[in-house]
């Protein structure tokens, strides 16, 4: 057992929130390292449903520390709303949540820029959540962003805010996308936000590294999925942050040498929200069956997810980028009623058959999936928590995925509750989780 990264191996929505929540009790700290409030982790505890967008799922475990790393962009209003909701539900937040002083701050102007630019003529529609995440990261990369540490220094913040917002207004007006903002009222509101979060702000890189040196363990919680990574995803239909394993280091300030392992989370099928290529998307009614059985609607937006079949070339690609030690397969029970389960094993582009992910969207949109069909099991797997109790055909399906991807399946989720989970004895997953 050591310091472990848990992240999505597909296009997000793989069920990471449940897995992080379930195993957080075995770690001392859970740290988020990228993204913003555009990605929601849904966790069920008995009759209670929690949708966490910024705060790590580990906050739901008594006595565990939760860290929001420097790689995130933070809308203070969204963060404080989440804190208030947790506290109202009896979850202790103060003293358990730590916010990086180097994380960037998201403003209403960022939302304005995103909403308007997404609809501009000639612009490729990415299908964003319109929460301003991309424009905030743009400011970060352009070195004009405002960080949490800046927000806490009132005099410095006021000067920086005036300069940045003046530029934003000029750009928005030039592009014809300006909508009226009361910049003074927003500034005052953010100064009030600063006082509420001040007790939780620190240098989280120091906190994490000191904890690791003292023998404590950290779980790094990824948001979204590798295929939405700014560098390695289906660009430009991606998010604006590093959603792969490398982002855990840059987004927290913890060195790669201090990471013990990487666990990938994947559905037993695959889904995607928003635009972009999706080679195995099912259009023949099977996609609708998966969506209804799996309740595939976005945790943040409520949008119906596009659904399709497991994509082996995609998984091999994300396993290679992240160095997965083990896979978690979620929502196995969603496939319980299928007689045959197609699995994409390669792609055909024209008269060529390829087994690797094409690098461009243009090529991705031309691929035809090559399927092999695996027999279904037509027996309920819902709630099973012991591998030996799975139907033989369900075990064969998991073995097939292992053989095709080259990565062990060390954990299987068969329902939304904590106890509806299988950990395979002797697996690399078990050794990393402890």
Swiss-Prot record:
Main location (coarse class): cytoplasm
PROSITE patterns the record matches: ADENYLOSUCCIN_SYN_1, ADENYLOSUCCIN_SYN_2
Catalyzed chemical reaction(s): IMP + L-aspartate + GTP = N(6)-(1,2-dicarboxyethyl)-AMP + GDP + phosphate + 2 H(+)
SUPFAM superfamilies reported in the protein's UniProt record: P-loop containing nucleoside triphosphate hydrolases
Pfam family of the protein (one): Adenylsucc_synt
Gene3D superfamilies: Adenylosuccinate Synthetase, subunit A, domain 1, Adenylosuccinate Synthetase, subunit A, domain 2, Adenylosuccinate Synthetase, subunit A, domain 3
Residues at the active site: 13, 41
BP GO annotations: 'de novo' AMP biosynthetic process; IMP metabolic process
GO molecular function, one term: GTP binding
Binding site for GTP: 12-18, 40-42, 305, 331-333, 413-415
Subcellular location: Cytoplasm
Binding-site positions, IMP: 13-16, 38-41, 129, 143, 224, 239, 303
Residue sites binding substrate per the record: 299-305
Pathway: Purine metabolism; AMP biosynthesis via de novo pathway; AMP from IMP: step 1/2
Functional note: Plays an important role in the de novo pathway of purine nucleotide biosynthesis. Catalyzes the first committed step in the biosynthesis of AMP from IMP.
Homology family: Belongs to the adenylosuccinate synthetase family.
Assembly description: Homodimer.
Protein name: Adenylosuccinate synthetase
